[in-house]
Amino acid sequence: MEVWTLKSLRWKIAIIIVGFILVTGTVLGGVNYFSARSILEDEIYNRQTQVALLLVQGIEDKLTQYQRILATMAEVAEIEAMDWDTAAPYLEEKILALKDFEIFYLVFPDNEFIGTEGNSGNLGDRAYIQETWSRQKGIISEPIISKATNVPVVAITAPIRDAEGTMIGILGGTLTLDFLTEMALDIAEGQAGYPYIIDDSGLVIAHPDASIRFQANFLNTEADYVTPELAAMTQQMVAGEQGLATYSLEGEEYLCSFAPMPLTG
C-alpha cells in the first residue's frame, strides 16, 4: 500500500489548513469588560490553545486515516481494472460504509471522471488532479467547490497502478467540510463560547451556524455583520498573529482568543 510519509502529509495539510484560525469566543454580556479580561484572559487563552491543538491533531488523524483507506482501496482488483462497471458496486458499498465521504470517483488518463452519484465530467483543470499525476502520489486538496455536487469539499486522491507499477488512473473521494465543524464542536463541548475556523482570505470554513459556512467573510467590511472591530481582528488573524481581541456583534460583546494553527506546528 502506498501512503505518504508524515512529512509530506503535513505539508499538504498545511496547504489546506494554512491560514485557518481557530477562535474561541466568550460572551461578556453585562460583566464589566476590564475586570473580566483580567480574570478570564489567561483562562481563555490557555483553553483556546488546548482546543486548537486538539482540533489540529484531530484533523490530521482523520485525514491520515482516510488517505490510508483510499490508498488501500486503489489496490483492489475492482479499482485496478479501471472499468466503471466493475468498480461501481465496490465503490457504492464503500460510500455507504464511510459516511464522511460525499462521493468516490475514478479519473481516467484523459482526466474524464465517473462518480458514485452517476456524475461525470473532466477534472483536468483541478490543481489537485494535476498534482496527483505529476507527483504520482496521493493528494489532499485545499477546500474547493465540488463539480459533482456544488458544495464545499476537500478531495483526497490515490494513484491507481497496473501490475508493472505504472500509474493508470486516480481514485478520488470528497469529504464535505461538515466534519471540521463537528470536530470543533465536539472538542469544545462544555466550554463557554464556541470555536470557528476561517481561511487566509477571511472566509468562514467551519462554524456552528451552517448558513455562515463558505458564505461569510470577516474581512468584507461592506457586509452588515462585519464590524470594524471584527474586521481588524480578522486582519490580525490572517496575518498569522496570535492574541486577544474584543468585538461586538448583534448586541453582544465577545472576548476572543485567536491563533494560527497550521498542521506543521
Task: Show which residues each predicted segment covers.
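Sensory beta-strand/linker motifs that couple input domains to effectors
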Residues: T166, L171-G173
